[in-house]
Amino acid sequence: MTSASPRLMPRPRALAPDFESPTPRHWFGGLALPTHVVNGVNLLFPAGERFFIRSVRYYLDKVDDPVLHEQARGFFGQEGRHAQAHESFFQVLTAQGYKVKDFLRIYEFIAYNGIERVAPPALRLAVTAACEHFTAILAEGTLRERFLDAAHPTLRALLMWHAAEEIEHKAVAFDVLQRVAPSYPLRVAGLLIAAACLSGFWIAATTMLLWQDRKFGAQRLGPQARLMRERRGLLSRVFGPGIRQYLRRDFHPSQNDNMQLAADYLQSVGAAPAQALS
C-alpha cells in the first residue's frame, strides 16, 4: 500500500517544563484518580519513545524515499525531546514521595531486555507503528475535547505540546513499516502486542501510584468517577474504534483528519507548524 500521508516535515520544538515551582500532588482538578491516570502514562513515555526511535532507525538505511527519510529524522528529534521532557517530571513524583524506580526498572527490563531483545526488528517496528496510532488518537482527543482544561498549567502545556507533535509524525513509523515489511499479519501482530503492553503497563503504573497515595482514600470518589466517565470516550476510542480502524487492510494514519487541529494549537502558543516537503 502506498503512503497517503501529507508530506509534512515533523518539526522538533524545544520545551523545558518549569518543575522548579511546586506542582500540586493532585494536579488534575485536585483529584487523585485522573491525576494518576495521566501520571501513569507519563511514566511510560520516555522508555517508550526511545524504543520507537530505535525501531524506526534500524530501517532508516533501507528507506529509499528521501521525503520519508527526512520525516523519520524529524520523528527522531520530536520523540527524543518528548522523552527528555517527560523524564524531567519523574523528579516531581519522587519529591512528592512516590517510589517509581522499581516500577521503571521492571518496565524497562520488559521493554528493552524482553521485547526489544527477543522480537525481530520487523515486529518491533510493527509494535511501534501501532503504538503511534494509539498515541495519535489520544492526542487528537486531548486537543479536540480539551481534556486537560482542569490540569495544572505546566503539565497541560507539556501534554498539549506532546499531543500536537504526535499528530505531526503519526504516519512516519507506519510508512516505514509499509516500505520495508508490508505484511498484514505482521501489522496485526504488532497491534496485538502494542495493545496488550500499553494497557497492561498503563494500568500497572496507575494502580501503583494510587496505592502509594495515602490521601486518595480520604477523597470523595464521586467527582472523580464522574470525571472519568465523562472522559471515558477518549480511552475507549483507543482500544475500541482505534483497533478496528487499524485492522482495516486499507488503513493509513492520514485517514484521521487532524493535522489542522495540531497546527491550530501550535500557532495558538506561538510555535510554527510542520513545514511542507516537496
Over which residues does each language-model region extend?
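Non-heme di-metal
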Residues: 2-278
